[in-house]
């Protein structure tokens, strides 16, 4: 007899349309799209872009995911997985208006929204209210900034997810040139 394989339970799922990041600028939209996909490739562990692909982050009970490595004091002595990148030129990120990594805030906003709907404990101190994130409700807009000095601005402009459950969860990103689908499963 073959036992049924347990199916994953989807706790939340949302999609980010990569064709609508900057609707008024084709060039800007391409930069945002490229930087979003590159950030996901770093999570996957292979920064060479190729499509489509899947990237996953598994969080055990009590584990934390931080979008970038500069952490607030309350997270410094905990088990933390980070986005494995600094969103800088040396890692291949493209600039827009002089800022390398433009677009990763849109990815962080998708993560905030989906993780919140899944019941994860979310800490996002810097809202992206200075510019809308198309397709993401305003309350989940998340501003990300990495500074090498690790100062308070970079620690506050981070996204932290904590698994409050007594079971592990996975963030599963399915990415293509057109969209990023994120689901949180148990």
Task: Enumerate the predicted regions with their spans.
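Well-ordered beta-sheet/strand-loop patches within structured domains
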Residues: 1-186
